[in-house]
């Protein structure tokens, strides 16, 4: 939507500029093209400036106690533009399975830094807040956007600190602030396989009695490689299914994690399975 609007505006401005100018013959074509490129780059710079200014006042050292409607609208506008620039052809299946009312825990396999962008873009009304590694808070603009979306940083090397993050996520769901999204492998898969899940994050669902939405994604690890070669990347995103809270009683988080793992692996296919030595 954003890129489309920018392109239309740039084209209109370019045509008007040339129509009001003194161009003739081939000069009309080259003049219009040059004006179009100039206006498009100008509009792109304005769009980036709006994002930068919006983030400039965000202080990530202060606790974020409320989800930002402004930043939700902002990412809803900008993410389709990012997907277009990166030539992502997102093929979403099973979205009708998402709970229509109430909060939930969303889990997905993790292949690329672009996975959260993909999920936010496909499910904008879900108000997803991600559990993320601490290093992501230091990324340019990204850390501030995450903060305003109530994303929670987790210390993967300290169990006590990690528990605090889990408890905060439980609190946010109980207070009906956001739904929580997490990559239960705990890290980006470097070999493309679906690695074993960390069962602790499933306690977010069992303690709050919310559904677990299982998603799988493919090919996001190839996006940057392909875009440098001007190639499109087909990105399948599947909502595999939903584990309902009625099935939780009498089961441990480990049991539920294993059920989710098995269903997601079945959807991804045998090429995502770990070697036997794992």
Model-derived segments and their meaning:
Residues 53-77, 84-85, 100-159:
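Catalytic core of membrane glycerolipid acyltransferases/transacylases, capturing the structured
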Residues 1-103:
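Membrane-anchoring hydrophobic helices of lipid-metabolizing enzymes
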Residues 92, 106, 130, 237-239:
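Generic preference for hydrophobic
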Residues 93, 131-133, 155-156, 184, ...:
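Thr-Gly-centered strand-to-loop micro-motif
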Residues 85-87, 125, 146-148, 175, ...:
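Short, well-ordered coil/turn elements that cap or connect secondary structure elements
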